[in-house]
Amino acid sequence: MIIPLKKTKKPSHSYDHIISGTVTIGGKTFFARSSWEANIAAYFEFLKNMGNIVDWRHEPKTFWFNGVRRGVVSYLPDFEIAENSGVVKYVEVKGYMDARSRTKLKRMKKYYPEVVVELIDKKRYAEIACKSHFIKNWGLLKK
């Protein structure tokens, strides 16, 4: 007897298109998990050179959610930005917000309410990308 294989549903979102690699921007060498991350680093270096921010760092600090034993127990922001005002904020670059990513941001609000986390989503990325012809090192990671 032949038992037909059960059809499995194709995932609604695939990460096959994401390009990652080691890049050097502004003298800082790091592993960019996506071309978006590399491009946003180039954008922050542009802002630094223009005097709009003091500095930026890639994946500088892990925030731990004390007491959480299952699921998301920590959060590693993509960037730390030191602003001219003295404020330090963290930036997350996300083209697609999955459940795990949403949980991380919700837990950040709960466990670290004083920490500023800015999200660069598709819309914000597109706004920045419109200025990419001014930004040195934009497009370092390509297929």
PLM features per residue range, with description:
Residues 1-143:
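Electrostatic, structured charged patches in enzyme active sites and in nucleic-acid/phosphate-binding
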